[in-house]
A protein has these predicted regions:
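Active-site machinery of serine-nucleophile hydrolases
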Residues: 45-47, 51-109
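Gly/Ser-rich "nucleophile elbow"/oxyanion-hole loop immediately N-terminal to the catalytic nucleophile
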Residues: 37-43, 98-135
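Short, proline-enriched alpha-helix->beta-strand connector loops that line the catalytic pocket
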Residues: 84, 171-177
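Extracytoplasmic/secreted cell-surface and envelope-processing proteins
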Residues: 58-60, 97-101, 138-142, 162-168, ...
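C-terminal catalytic histidine-bearing segment of alpha/beta-hydrolase fold enzymes
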Residues: 180, 186, 192, 203-331
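Short alpha-helix in the alpha/beta-hydrolase fold that links the catalytic acid
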Residues: 62-63, 189-203
């Protein structure tokens, strides 16, 4: 999905602040407060934290200009959250210092910014803090969630740039995790990153119903402005910004998503195929003091994890993915990625 200028009306509702200085950094961020726009001040509301990808934090404010997540302050999305609203927070990595979300040196500074935000906004429901991230931001989410699992109720990892480690997966064994990846992503390779992550999560979790894996055969390409290099099928977050409805058109039985998203399929940790999955309703089921899950009706029949994670031969043979992997290594050595 291209940048939507009409979403600027939502960006104008966001404010800026920063957390306390921890070590070398005080993390600045953009945020939306539902109580500033009519939400009942007697209620508590979830907090959704989104860690964006590299280059989206190049300067202050870009973190809400470079993607469409600010649209979640629209009433149609706010109304889907527990208690009918949610705080939204998009922190910015100090990229001007060459530091990105994948670097563990930011974990304590980011955690301090979140705690400080909750202290400043008394209507935040501290049992419903949700953490989302994509690309390098998903690595920041892995780092933070595994370091402080008690802080978060659930996490969503999109197009991770590396596989989770065994120790990280073990620390997340009680946390609901939704993993998303495109099997044809030429930047974050499915077989190297997402697939091993899924296997480790499934083998360590205390509740497989709390896990979800969404894969695509086609997603949106990403172009790096400074060198015009395409990261094919890498952008999954535009679809997340639409709560997987994508302009009101949900996941359908023909495996087609409106626009560039095709071949979307979602399963839980048991291998059950899930019909019509949506991010916000899934997040809203969880608290960090009483994790639970309600099984979503399966589409057709339950399939095994082993059967699901193989490529669907109707769309693409596994060898094609290996070719993409080899090309990616070559492109990186040539400096094209």
């Amino acid at each position: 999905m291209a940048y939507k200028a009409e979403h600027n009306k939502y960006r104008e509702l966001w404010k800026r602040d920063n957390g306390p200085m921890i070590g070398k950094w005080d993390i600045d961020y953009s945020y939306y407060s539902p109580v500033d726009y009519g939400a009942d001040k007697k209620k508590k509301y979830p907090l959704c934290i989104v860690l964006v990808g590299a280059l989206e934090g190049a300067f202050e404010g870009l973190e809400i200009q470079a993607n469409e997540m600010p649209v979640w302050c629209d009433e149609k999305y706010q109304s889907r959250f527990y208690n009918g609203g949610s705080y939204l927070m998009i922190p910015r990595a100090p990229e001007e210092d060459g530091i990105y979300w994948d670097q563990s040196c930011l974990v304590d500074s980011l955690k301090a910014a979140i705690v400080d935000f909750c202290d400043k906004h008394e209507n935040v429901d501290k049992s419903r803090i949700y953490l989302l991230g994509w690309c390098l931001g998903s690595l920041g989410a892995m780092n933070l969630a595994s370091a402080y699992p008690e802080l978060f109720a659930a996490t969503v990892l999109m197009a991770p740039d590396r596989a989770i480690t065994k120790s990280e997966a073990e620390r997340l064994r009680e946390m609901p995790v939704w993993l998303m990846a495109a099997k044809t992503d030429t930047h974050s390779f499915y077989h190297f990153n997402a697939l091993p992550t899924w296997k480790l999560l499934c083998s360590t979790t205390n509740n497989k119903l709390n896990l979800r894996l969404t894969t695509y055969l086609r997603a949106v390409d990403v172009y790096l402005v400074h060198n015009a290099v395409a990261m094919c099928n890498h952008n999954l977050w535009d679809n997340v910004s639409e709560d997987l409805h994508f302009e009101g058109v949900p996941y359908d039985r023909d495996k087609i998503i409106s626009g560039s998203y095709k071949g979307m399929k979602t399963v839980d940790g048991t291998g059950a195929v899930l019909y019509d999955p949506h991010i916000i309703s899934w997040l809203s089921k969880f608290t960090n003091d009483g994790r639970s899950a309600i099984r979503t009706p399966a589409l057709n029949k339950t399939v095994s994890e082993k059967a699901y994670i193989r490529f669907n031969e109707d769309f693409m043979h596994e060898a094609h993915q290996k070719i993409f992997a080899v090309l990616g290594v070559i492109y990186r050595k040539l400096g094209w990625l």
